[in-house]
Amino acid sequence: MKKIQVVAHCLLDPETRLAGLRPVAFAAEPPIIQLLCPEAGCLGLDRWAVTKNQIDIPSYRRYCREIFSHHADLIEQFAKKGYEIEVVGVEGSPSCGIKSTTLGYTGGKIRPQDHEHVPGMGVFMEEVTGELKRRDVSFRLVEARYRIK
């Protein structure tokens, strides 16, 4: 069966990652569809770190659905042509995590904050998978890892 990878933007373009984070080791297996980065698009390249609880708001979810809608149209067509769809997210991302995300920042004045990596899916990937399920598109989830455990 032919496969197409649907990948988080920063896996192919590390310049969109939060400043100071190292690139994620990832080897693309073409053909691929590169998703837009919702954090860079919504919050900019000079953004501060965020946690899922900060971006899990209606306007950010709506933005995620909007930027994914055209990709979903294409992915649905590939699925109908028999392609296996593999969605690749990023470990620990508040937006693109598949198995793990982050929680903890509480807002307020700038000050030291603690956050933790927790089991769960990021906001963007929740919207991506929800839309693919709504369209009855079968897919497999993979999480690219960057931390040494």
Q: PLM ranges: what are they?
A:
Residues M1-Q5:
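Extreme N-terminal starter segment of soluble prokaryotic enzymes
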Residues C10, V90-P94:
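Short, well-ordered beta-to-alpha junction loops that form the rim of enzyme active sites
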Residues P14, S95-K99, I148-K149:
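Short, well-ordered, mixed-charge alpha-helical segments that flank or form enzyme active sites
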Residues E15-P58:
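Short, surface-exposed acidic-centric catalytic microdomains
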Residues L45-K52, I57-D73, K109-K149:
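Divalent-metal-activated hydrolytic enzyme cores
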Residues F78-Y83:
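Glycine-rich phosphate-binding loop signature in dinucleotide/nucleotide-binding domains
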Residues E84-V90:
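Short glycine-rich phosphate-binding loop at a beta-alpha junction
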Residues S95-Q113:
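Active-site-adjacent alpha-helix immediately C-terminal to a catalytic or transition-state-stabilizing loop
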